[in-house]
């Protein structure tokens, strides 16, 4: 497992990779920080997937046209994978409620409850690129962001969703 750190307007971002795909992206101080990392990691800032992620993040924070996402490989249960896949379908500048995601999962034949969806969203190991910040409470309120509500607000304002 390989790791590196990148500066950002949110503070340091910590990246992890299996060598070919991004497996983690955490904001400094984030809840569940690096929870999927093994004890042994190697610092390798020149890894191609890290360079691709850095280019994507630079464009994102500059509000420039986004290049292709780097390959992503988040680790999680099939339920969490389904939730994270739905998060990736939410366009920049838009949001969804936990309840709306729950209904989408049910329509796909996946039993779900908003609390379970919230748990999956909260344990997203690849922040920003899997846009869990686009998920809101039933009343449209900013709730539960592992990176902190101030950072969630910053990202949604950057995207024009607030």
Where are these regions (language model features)?
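Basic nucleic-acid-binding alpha-helical/helix-turn surface characteristic of O6-alkylguanine DNA
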Residues: 1-108, 160-162
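Short clusters of hydrophobic/aromatic residues that line enzyme substrate/ligand-binding pockets
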Residues: 72, 117, 142-145
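N-terminal positioning helix adjacent to the helix-turn-helix/winged-helix DNA-binding module
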Residues: 79-83, 113, 151
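Major-groove recognition helix of helix-turn-helix-like DNA-binding domains
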Residues: 87, 114-123
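Short, basic interhelical loop/turn and adjoining N-cap
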Residues: 106-116
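Major-groove DNA-recognition helix of helix-turn-helix-type DNA-binding domains
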Residues: 129
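Short cysteine clusters
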Residues: 132
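…primarily DNA-binding HTH/wHTH and HhH modules…
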Residues: 138-162
């Amino acid at each position: 497992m390989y790791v590196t750190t990148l500066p950002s307007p949110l503070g340091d971002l910590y990246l992890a990779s299996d060598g070919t795909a991004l497996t983690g992206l955490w904001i400094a101080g984030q809840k569940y920080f690096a929870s999927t990392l093994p004890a042994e990691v190697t610092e390798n800032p020149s890894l191609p997937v890290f360079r691709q992620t850095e280019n994507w993040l630079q464009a994102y924070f500059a509000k420039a046209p986004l290049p292709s996402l780097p390959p992503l490989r988040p680790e999680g249960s099939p339920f969490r994978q389904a939730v994270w896949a739905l998060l990736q379908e939410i366009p920049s500048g838009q949001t969804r409620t936990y309840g709306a995601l729950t209904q989408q999962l049910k329509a796909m034949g996946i039993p779900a409850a908003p609390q379970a969806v919230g748990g999956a969203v909260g344990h997203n190991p690849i922040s920003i690129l899997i846009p869990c910040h686009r998920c809101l409470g039933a009343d449209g309120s900013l709730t539960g962001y592992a990176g902190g509500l101030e950072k969630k607000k910053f990202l949604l304002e950057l995207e024009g969703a607030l």
